[in-house]
Amino acid sequence: MPQTIEHLPNGLTLRQDDRFFKLGQDSVLLSAFARPRRNARVLDLGCGTGALALLIYRPDLQITGLEIQEGALDLFRQSIADNGVKMTALQGDLRRIRALLPHGSMDYVICNPPYFDRGAGKSAASPEKQTARQDASCTVEDVTVAASFVLHTGGKAAFVFRPERLWTLLEALSRVRLVPKRLRFVHQNTLAPPSAVLAECRKGGSAEGLIVEPPLLVQSEEYSRIYEK
């Protein structure tokens, strides 16, 4: 399968091919929204070809990407080597997270989870893309359970999701003690409904203190800065 190389806003490169979803807006915006502390242990759940892990890269972070599809993980490993950065590419099913990573071993989780229920939404062009786009291999609940398991109390997780399924995400988060602390909606313009929502949660603690940040508008100066950083 022919590969392409994407140049990321932070100067790193990403290997891709047509079997898997290529770099999109969601991963770029989530990487700008997420705020792992210095020297944090970070897990990218369902990392695919590693776009989000590479976008969020800082030399002080200890980043692990977990992915079920070996082909996608191979591309991630190649990108790690291309960039000369230190990351861990881990093959495994997040539904079996207890056999893969220790409980409470992460400070921060990032994830672009499945958008649609199985059988809903547009059909993907390949089985690999179908797995990534829909709840075919795991559900949103599987994702939140895995995130909560690896986070220590006080650890945080950041997600990007479809606004029309926000309640599904919030319900799943509440079942595993992940409390939303920051929300930000992405709009194509000032008159359009949101096309994506960014959410940061904290494991444990009070449900008070949710911050809804100002909308992020596509084609705004801030949006351009995110892509040009």
Question: What is each model feature region?
Answer:
Residues R15, T64, T88-L90, K181-R184:
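General small-molecule cofactor/ligand-binding pocket signal
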Residues R19, S137-P194:
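Conserved Class I SAM-dependent methyltransferase catalytic core
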Residues P113-D142:
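Mobile active-site "lid"/loop adjacent to the S-adenosyl-L-methionine
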Residues Q3-R41, C47-Y57, I211-V212:
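SAM-dependent Rossmann-like transferase core, predominantly class I methyltransferases
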Residues S31, A125-E128, R175-V176:
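Glycine-rich, phosphate-binding/catalytic loops in enzymes
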